[in-house]
Design a protein with these regions (language model features):
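Residues forming the flavin
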Residues: 1-293
Length: 293
């Protein structure tokens, strides 16, 4: 884009387009951890999310790339990252793995040490899921080169001390004991959830959803970007949590699939419609959620 390509004064408007195919790539929303009371987000000054520390680390961010404590603006000496906040937790309705938290936590932990080599960093994890190309080597580098400490166990509670430092109580499942360590800054590695408004769009497109709220594909292996609605395709986190390489690959696949009916010019659709039997219908509307037609 050239200079002044973005019109900041533009107002919201509704337009109507006639299209042949649709690719739903609506992204995601980061999980809001304020509902997990024991972690104190929104109550404790020095408890932040991964998105907030990403903003700090960015050279064009408000701190010029330096990680600081929100309480006093000073650089923290001890930093803790808590993985799986808003993921793999059935108590809050998020039983799925977000697939990105482990790796972006290690990335941010390394950057903290790059900016301030004396920083002590600890990662609390349930399981390290370094599944992608080069990810296991990245995990090994975090341990051996950067000296990041990994504690296997999900923290039970965070306490704020009088000096605004934070004490994490957690069970180290490898040692089989409860630990309490104090940190200057705690970062909650939040998971991914379906974007706001995605359910309304899903109903408009006539697409089914999985139990976790993401759009359901026609077949997880054979048609991973197709839906049961002809002409509608899905890509990225709209279909389920995934990282950038997988999102890019799926976006390319969805574009290729969408190009097929466009190149043909016309498509024959199956004349299948759904009808309800008013004599036995209880008006529960469960069929609306389940029926692909």
């Amino acid at each position: 884009c050239g200079p002044d390509a973005i019109d900041h004064n533009q107002e919201a408007s509704e337009i109507e387009l006639e299209v042949g195919t649709i690719v739903a790539a609506i992204g995601y929303d980061p999980f809001d951890p304020s509902g997990i009371y024991q972690y104190g987000y929104g109550r404790y000054t020095n408890v932040i999310t991964a998105m907030e520390i990403e903003r700090m680390i960015n050279a064009s961010g408000p701190t010029g790339g330096h990680v600081i404590k929100p309480s006093d603006g000073l650089e923290p000496k001890r930093v803790a990252f808590i993985h799986c906040v808003g993921s793999r937790d059935e108590t809050i309705g998020k039983p799925y793995c977000s697939r990105v938290c482990c790796m972006y936590s290690m990335k941010n932990a390394q950057l903290c040490i790059d900016h301030e080599p004396d920083t002590e960093v600890t990662c609390y994890y349930m399981d390290i899921r370094a599944f992608g190309k080069g990810y296991e080597e990245f995990y090994k580098t975090s341990q051996e080169k950067y000296g990041i400490e990994f504690i296997r166990g999900k923290p039970a509670q965070i306490f704020e001390n009088d000096d605004l430092t934070l004490t994490i109580r957690a069970e180290d499942t490898l040692l089989g004991k409860v630990t309490e360590y104090t940190y200057d800054l705690v970062v909650l590695s939040v998971g991914l959830e379906h974007a706001e408004g995605s359910d309304e769009l899903r109903q408009t497109l006539g697409v089914s959803k999985s139990a976790d709220g993401f759009y359901m594909e026609a077949h997880p292996k054979l048609r991973p970007v197709d839906t049961l609605t002809d002409g509608v395709y899905i890509a990225g986190v709209a279909q389920g949590p995934k990282d950038i390489p997988d999102s890019v690959a799926q976006g390319s696949a969805a574009a290729s699939r969408a190009a097929i009916p466009m190149a043909q010019g016309q498509v024959e659709i199956e004349p299948i419609i759904a009808a309800n039997d008013e004599a036995i219908c209880g008006a529960c509307e469960v069929c609306v959620e389940l029926c692909p037609y």
